[in-house]
Amino acid sequence: MSIYTRPVMLLLCGLLLLTLAIAVLNTLVPLWLAQANLPTWQVGMVSSSYFTGNLVGTLFTGYLIKRIGFNRSYYLASLIFAAGCVGLGVMVGFWSWMSWRFIAGIGCAMIWVVVESALMCSGTSHNRGRLLAAYMMVYYMGTFLGQLLVSKVSGELLHVLPWVTGMILAGILPLLFTRIVNQQTQARHSSSISAMLKLRQARLGVNGCIISGIVLGSLYGLMPLYLKHQGMANASIGFWMAVLVSAGILGQWPMGRLADKFGRLLVLRVQVFVVILGSIAMLTQAAMAPALFILGAAGFTLYPVAMAWACEKVEHHQLVAMNQALLLSYTVGSLLGPSFAAMLMQNYSDNLLFIMIASVSFIYLLMLLRNVGQTPNPVAHI
């Protein structure tokens, strides 16, 4: 029986449309703010309000799923995201845009929690890696296509908002034709995010999501700046970023399959080691293409494998809470990593971007090498 059931395929189709909209807005909002002559610190504050919304949305979505189920939570999340999009055209100004991006951030985080939790609850310990790999492939493909859309269509605010809003609403349609069962509502005991974060046997998965956030946040946010400082033109920067993201897309399926077959612990060790090698290779600047490719293939696949590791260690009814904890951990890492790396780059050297990535990866590798007690029969086996 295929792991890609009808509900899973429809869920991923909806996610693709929503991710396209997210990618377009995340690229154009800072440009719209700059065109409005807002100072850089205000542009940064609007971006921060979006990520703050991500944190807030992550915290309460589990409760929402338990109360109204996956489908209705997904509809509500999409409508909140659409409202945050429409608001940008209704009210113009720093404070109003901060508010609307905060609302959009809540909606986006809710979408991620709902989709990831639904996929984990649909799978088993034997195929969850492949399900999460498919999720990440769709997510990165949507991000990639969103960047292409930005380069091909008009970037005017009032030209973009109508079709982006329509795309968000179209993302609701696939789930109108299926129902995703929430087995958590039948559980006697609910789990909290804090309890999942404290769970000793899942700590490597939580730490892996933090490290993944640091690595990806730093690469996404600061790699273009690093390349710019190397004297590259915008077209060249776009090419190398495409290489990085493409490697992440291509690496998802093999890593997910290997993790299901040989175990997540072994695959995580190999991934982290390859991230370290890729970072060191970037410092030499001798072979940027293979260095960026292996860095993208290993770095962009850390998150789903770490998620699958953590989800092996909990009961089935705890999967939604665990997913919230993992997404929260990733978000914290993606906020801290670029901030710290940017400070190092500004005050010392651009090369410290890769030294930092290699250093945090090495610390995580030591944690993985210390763990020799991988559970042969995972708890979440159903």
UniProtKB/Swiss-Prot annotation:
SUPFAM superfamilies, alphabetized: MFS general substrate transporter
Record localization: Cell inner membrane
Keywords from the named record: Cell inner membrane, Cell membrane, Membrane, Transmembrane, Transmembrane helix, Transport
Pfam families named in the record: MFS_1
Cytoplasmic face of the membrane: 1-7, 66-74, 123-130, 178-203, 252-269, 312-324, 370-382
Ranges of the Periplasmic topological domain: 29-44, 96-101, 152-156, 225-230, 346-348
Residues that span the membrane, as ranges: 8-28, 45-65, 75-95, 102-122, 131-151, 157-177, 204-224, 231-251, 270-290, 291-311, 325-345, 349-369
CDD domains: MFS_YcaD_like
GO cellular component: plasma membrane
Major location (coarse): membrane
Membrane topology term: Multi-pass membrane protein
One annotated GO molecular function: transmembrane transporter activity
Family of the protein in this entry: Belongs to the major facilitator superfamily. YcaD (TC 2.A.1.26) family.
HAMAP family in alphabetical order: MFS_YcaD
Annotated NCBIfam families: PRK03633.1
PANTHER family, alphabetized: TRANSPORTER MFS SUPERFAMILY (PTHR23521:SF2)
The protein, known as: Uncharacterized MFS-type transporter YcaD
Organism: Salmonella typhi
Gene: ycaD
